[in-house]
Design a protein with these regions (language model features):
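Active-site rim helix/loop that mediates acceptor-substrate recognition in acyltransferases
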Residues: 25-55, 60, 65-66
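Conserved acyl-donor/pantetheine-binding loop and adjacent beta-alpha core of acyl/acetyltransferases
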Residues: 60-94
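Conserved GNAT acetyl-CoA-binding A-motif
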Residues: 89-90, 118-131
Length: 160
């Protein structure tokens, strides 16, 4: 299984929308708004392409703020939010790997593609994970620690 890792550009927005709608069952219009409004960091986002040119994975990074993801944290724990916002961070907006590549080294390779930049420019990565997803253990194995939860997600912090 050979593949190439490429940095994404705004031209990849429709690809991101398509993958998120297909993978998560989200409403297309809502995902299109997110992609437009949530400060995607395209230069840190990665797509994996197999040797036939098929996209097999997307890692979308975004510079949106924690309170844009969960406004409830401002009410529940404003001191925590202030401490987190005093640091430099970026968010994992979505991380999707084609099913036949799950359990391979692809996820790791995609993260390692951007790790030097993450370590150089950020104090932590903000990772919101919907309760229904199975990726909680994945991020915990990377060392991410839960800092908040609401009715939709568990919010993790992966220190750099």
């Amino acid at each position: 299984m050979s593949y190439t890792l490429l940095r994404m550009t705004p031209a990849d927005a429709p690809l991101t929308v398509e993958w998120m709608v297909r993978q998560y069952g989200f409403d297309r219009t809502e995902v299109e708004m997110w992609v437009c409004d949530l400060h995607f960091n395209w230069s840190l986002s990665v797509k994996a392409v197999d040797d036939k040119g098929n996209v097999i994975g997307l890692l979308n990074m975004s510079d949106y703020r924690i309170e844009e993801e969960t406004a409830q944290i401002q009410k529940d724990n404003p001191d925590l939010l202030a401490r987190l916002n005093s640091q430099r961070y970026t968010a994992v907006f979505s991380f999707i790997v084609r099913e036949d590549y799950r359990g391979t080294h692809l996820n790791y390779d995609m993260m390692m593609e951007i790790m030097p930049e993450l370590k150089a420019h950020y104090d932590f990565i903000f990772i919101p994970v919907l309760h229904r997803l199975k990726t909680h253990g994945y991020w915990q194995r990377w060392g991410a620690r839960e800092f908040y939860r609401d009715s939709d997600c568990v919010y993790y912090q992966l220190k750099m």
